[in-house]
């Protein structure tokens, strides 16, 4: 096989990954995302929901979920990752405003702490409705915390 053709399988995978990233980028720019709510129950009383974990889902143009495993590691350290965190926070806080007894955990990257638009979303909602802070749980991914521990320490102090 001529060297310039490369490995066909590797080329197909790279092409698929590029197409997936472009779909994610387009979906995020159009805010074509939704939250999936995973209940977290109490150990003492498994029939009682303690809170919900709000998981962001990016939708393609046919409204199907693009599996996060296909893009998350590539975007974690990019602006696109920060934009997804902003959308998750905005959608989660909006749901909490609409449902006053809703307690949510929202996943995020530690890098989003230093991302001005993310902090603006958080501050805008908390300034309008301070009780949201009592019901909001921010779940910072372990991998991102290990990469920028100083940001997390400053945010939590």
Task: Label each region the model flagged.
Residues 1-18, 101-110:
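Flexible, glycine/charge-rich interdomain/linker segments that couple
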Residues 6-72:
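Active-site core of bacterial EAL-family cyclic-dinucleotide phosphodiesterase domains
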Residues 23, 71, 95, 154-155:
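Residues within well-ordered alpha-helices
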Residues 25, 123, 152-157:
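Short amphipathic alpha-helical segments and helix-helix/interface helices
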Residues 27, 62-65, 78, 82-83, ...:
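Residues at alpha-helix boundaries and the short loops/turns that link adjacent helices
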């Amino acid at each position: 096989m001529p060297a310039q053709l490369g490995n066909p399988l590797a080329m197909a995978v790279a092409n698929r990954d590029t197409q997936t990233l472009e779909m994610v980028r387009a979906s995020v720019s159009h805010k074509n995302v939704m939250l999936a709510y995973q209940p977290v129950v109490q150990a003492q009383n498994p029939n009682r929901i303690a809170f919900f974990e709000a998981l962001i889902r990016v939708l393609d143009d046919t409204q199907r979920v693009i599996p996060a495993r296909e893009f998350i590691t590539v975007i974690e350290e990019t602006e696109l990752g920060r934009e997804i965190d902003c959308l998750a926070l905005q959608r989660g806080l909006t749901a909490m405003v609409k449902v006053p007894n809703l307690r949510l955990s929202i996943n995020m990257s530690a890098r989003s702490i230093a991302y001005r638009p993310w902090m603006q979303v958080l501050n805008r909602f908390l300034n309008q409705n301070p009780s949201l802070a009592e019901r909001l749980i921010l779940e910072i991914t372990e991998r991102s915390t290990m990469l920028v521990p100083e940001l997390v320490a400053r945010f939590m102090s």
